[in-house]
Amino acid sequence: QLDVNELDTSATFALPFFFNSPANLNRAPLLITPGFGLQLWDGPQTTAANNFVELPANTYDVFIDTAWNPQFTPLFGAELGIRVGIYTNWDELVWQSWRLMGRAIGTLNLTPQWQAKVGIVYLDRNQVKLLPAVGATWVPNANSRYDIFFPAPKAAWRFTQWRNRAVWGFIAGEYGGGAWTFNQSGNAGVTEFDYNDVRISLGTEMVPVTARGLAG
């Protein structure tokens, strides 16, 4: 049995980026997100019979994410992003502790309410490198949004607005997990560890109504 508890914190800054370009019809800002994550591991029980790897008590994520979601034409757009970070328990920092992730998704506006999506998500894990990204987004009105989308489906509803922020509630799915490096006790060298799962989450989020400033 393996248990993990996670704590993640991040803040998103929206910066002007090609605002006057004809390839950015929606004036999409460049989104910069520095973040930090902590994982608290419990298990698995290591015995001579199972030969499981003994995991560290803690691992950490330190990353910066950039994203840009331009609308190139009234029909075609994109969702682009790159994340670079260090994923380790800090016992020993090696080249494998660095990970580069990204996503490149093309969008097609079928109707004012429906948008089709297809692309790839690069995870840079030891076992799973790439995932296909395919699905559609349905926005029936200004107060609801449905992402029927692999690997991150989501349904969200806008409840109210507080100052310059819209308050949304959501239910979402996610292909979760990650990859870390650590120095295993009694083992010379660095161990690379993958953890993969499927997650369901409920929550609220506050989204700035304006396109600039601190968002997270």
Predicted regions span which residues?
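Outer-membrane beta-barrel translocator domains and adjoining extracellular loop/strand segments
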Residues: 1, 43-51, 90-97, 128-135, ...
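Transmembrane beta-strands of outer-membrane beta-barrel pores
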Residues: 36-44, 70, 84-90, 120-126, ...
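Outer-membrane beta-barrel translocator/channel fold
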Residues: 43-54, 150-216
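Transmembrane beta-barrel domains of Gram-negative outer membranes and organellar outer membranes
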Residues: 1-92
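Residues that define the transmembrane beta-barrel architecture of outer-membrane proteins
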Residues: 3-9, 56-62, 94-100, 128-132, ...
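Residues on the lipid-exposed face of transmembrane beta-strands in outer-membrane beta-barrel proteins
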Residues: 9-17, 62-70, 102-110, 120, ...
